[in-house]
């Protein structure tokens, strides 16, 4: 009796674990471009309307960076402003009023002063297609 109970438990547990297998999605072309060029992923935000503002915290644990790249996925978006706040509180506002197509990247954005800790990046942007939700990713190297 005990043996059949254990066997039933093992079969049930195996079936449950088999359902927990997670498949990862392959990187999109824009992400592949960033990774091929030595950039590391810093975070992402979703654009939730025609006008949106988001803060992407980065922090000392992520390292020091001398360049940034913006990757846009899923839908076109317009970035009105981007403000980089460094670890020492200094701010940098690269010229970024750009329209991004779906699955595209920005140019490499050189940061002033060499490799630096980034505290946060503020984005002000808007979707270009009603009802679409663009994903904006930040990459650094």
What is each of the regions a protein language model found here?
Residues 1-13:
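Bacterial N-terminal signal peptides that target proteins for export
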Residues 16-36:
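Bacterial Sec signal peptide processing site at the extreme N-terminus
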Residues 34-45:
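Local beta-strand/beta-hairpin segments that build beta-sheet-rich folds
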Residues 43-45, 94-101:
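Solvent-exposed serine/threonine-rich low-complexity stretches and specific carbohydrate-binding patches
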Residues 47-79:
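Short, surface-exposed binding/anchoring microloops in extracellular/periplasmic proteins
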Residues 54-59, 105-112:
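Exposed aromatic-hydrophobic patches
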Residues 63-70, 112-130:
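Noncatalytic modules at the cell exterior or secretory-pathway interfaces
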Residues 73-96, 132-141:
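Short, surface-exposed beta-strand/strand-loop-strand elements in extracellular ectodomains
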């Amino acid at each position: 009796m005990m043996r059949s109970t254990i066997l039933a438990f093992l079969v049930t547990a195996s079936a449950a674990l088999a359902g927990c297998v997670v498949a990862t999605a392959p990187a999109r072309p824009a992400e592949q471009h960033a990774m091929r060029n030595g950039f590391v992923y810093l975070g992402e935000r979703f654009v939730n309307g025609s006008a949106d503002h988001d803060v992407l915290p980065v922090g000392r644990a992520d390292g020091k960076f001398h360049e940034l790249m913006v990757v846009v996925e899923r839908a076109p978006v317009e970035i009105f402003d981007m403000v980089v706040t460094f670890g020492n509180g200094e701010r940098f506002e690269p010229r970024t009023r750009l329209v991004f197509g779906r699955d595209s990247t920005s140019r490499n954005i050189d940061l002033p002063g060499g490799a630096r800790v980034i505290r946060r990046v503020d984005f002000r942007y808007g979707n270009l297609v009603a009802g679409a939700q663009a994903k904006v990713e930040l990459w650094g190297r």
